Curated annotation (Swiss-Prot):
It is a peripheral membrane protein. It is found in: Cell membrane. GO terms for cellular component: plasma membrane. Pfam families: Glyco_tran_28_C, Glyco_transf_28. Belongs to the glycosyltransferase 28 family. MurG subfamily. Gene3D superfamilies: Glycogen Phosphorylase B. Pathway: Cell wall biogenesis; peptidoglycan biosynthesis. It catalyses: Mur2Ac(oyl-L-Ala-gamma-D-Glu-L-Lys-D-Ala-D-Ala)-di-trans,octa-cis-undecaprenyl diphosphate + UDP-N-acetyl-alpha-D-glucosamine = beta-D-GlcNAc-(1->4)-Mur2Ac(oyl-L-Ala-gamma-D-Glu-L-Lys-D-Ala-D-Ala)-di-trans,octa-cis-undecaprenyl diphosphate + UDP + H(+). This is UDP-N-acetylglucosamine--N-acetylmuramyl-(pentapeptide) pyrophosphoryl-undecaprenol N-acetylglucosamine transferase. Keywords: Cell cycle, Cell division, Cell membrane, Cell shape, Cell wall biogenesis/degradation, Glycosyltransferase, Membrane, Peptidoglycan synthesis, Transferase. InterPro entries: GlcNAc_MurG, Glyco_trans_28_C, GlycoTrans_28_N. GO terms for molecular function: undecaprenyldiphospho-muramoylpentapeptide beta-N-acetylglucosaminyltransferase activity. It comes from the Bacteria.
Length: 360
């Protein structure tokens, strides 16, 4: 009988990416892989799109809010139903372990696994834990963190960032699709790549639309999240979504303008790619992107610009400063010790799962 592992995590791409890196490794080693999530969530979309041999189990989900809302009352019942469904799934599958990447959908499966005596492993990407992982921590066997946590927590293992992105440009797959893009770009201009993520692309899209003069100063690549904006014209390439083209576009860019999600930031760090961070503010998030951006700026990896300050004048000043000190930023990024390979983390996770099973 094959070993089984349950994955959970969703709500944003960032809560799914690491799972999609780990899952093929478990499958290759003969594990039977299952995933608990929201059938209407991005986790289901990404699992389906991946084509991986994964059985998806849908549960009811309710959002965890830090503020009063009448929706909280309805969501209490959704979370309770999700917990009952998770208990049934875990009891039926009897997995060796559960791995959670966070997000509100992950809390019921984590609690269910703990109640049924299954080891629970959690990964936290941000500078501080989100509400879901703060709750899940109480039920976890081990929590792996990208950043060193300010609080000394007994279950925490500081790991560093896990990314499959690499620095060596010679290893980056060639893309014939980008040949057409290059025909519209000027070799005399710097190329900027704007990455807004699933929650933050709109501001970048609007900024580029409002300032057509940007195309006179730079080649612009804009990952929009909106197929209605798709365009290829002089010095401008707008595309709604990329998968295989993601890293070739990264390599093509001289500088990346990004939000403050930790997954993207550490990919840029792994590539030693010059970048400007425009983090989501507290009005649009819990403030984790502000913390991530400040951490990167203090380490000398990047420069940050707050969203209310995103004017053409301030943007041009930031570009000038980054390009003027490009060698310093790149040297600092190349010297980092904060990146781990997927194979390293997979081996660590497998060892920790084995240890947890033996201790039962």
């Amino acid at each position: 009988m094959p070993k089984k592992i349950l994955f959970t995590g969703g709500g944003t791409v960032g809560h799914v990416t690491l799972n999609l890196i780990l899952i093929p490794k478990f499958i290759k080693d003969g594990w039977e892989v299952h995933y608990i999530g929201d059938k209407n969530g991005i986790e289901h979309t990404e699992i389906e799109k991946s084509g991986l041999d994964v059985t998806f189990h849908a549960i009811a989900t309710g959002k965890l809010r830090r503020y009063f809302s009448w929706q909280n009352l309805a969501d209490v019942f959704k979370v309770a139903l999700g917990l009952l469904q998770s208990l049934f799934i875990v009891a039926k599958l009897r997995p060796q372990a559960l791995f959670s990447k966070g997000g509100f959908v992950s809390v019921p499966p984590v609690v269910a696994a703990k109640l049924l005596g299954k080891p629970v492993f959690i990964h936290e990407s941000d500078r501080s834990m989100g509400l879901a992982n703060k709750i899940a921590y109480k039920f976890a066997t081990t929590v792996y963190t990208t950043f060193e946590q300010e609080d000394q927590l007994s279950k925490v293992k500081h790991l560093g960032a896990v990314t499959k992105v690499f620095k060596d440009a010679n290893q980056i797959p060639e893309s014939t699709q980008l040949e057409a893009v290059n025909e519209y770009f000027s070799r005399d201009l710097k190329t900027l790549l704007f990455i807004g993520g699933s929650a933050g692309a709109h501001v970048f899209n609007q900024f580029i639309s409002d300032h057509p003069e940007l195309k006179q100063r730079y080649n612009i690549i804009n990952i929009t999240g909106d197929p209605h904006l798709n365009e290829l014209s002089s010095h401008l390439y707008r595309v709604d979504y990329v998968t295989d083209l993601y890293q070739p576009l990264m390599a093509m860019a001289d500088l990346v303008v990004t939000r403050g999600g930790s997954n993207t930031l550490f990919e840029l760090l792994a590539m030693a790619k010059l970048h400007l961070i425009v983090p989501l503010g507290k009005e649009a998030s819990r403030g984790d992107q502000l913390e991530n951006a400040t951490y990167f700026e203090k380490r000398g990896y990047a420069k940050q610009l707050q969203e209310p300050d995103l004017t053409l004048h301030n943007f041009d000043q930031a570009m000038a400063d980054l390009f003027e000190h490009q060698a310093d930023y790149e040297a600092t990024m190349l010297a980092t010790k904060e990146i781990q390979s997927p194979d390293f983390f997979y081996d660590l996770l497998r060892a920790d799962i084995s240890s947890a099973i033996k201790e039962k």
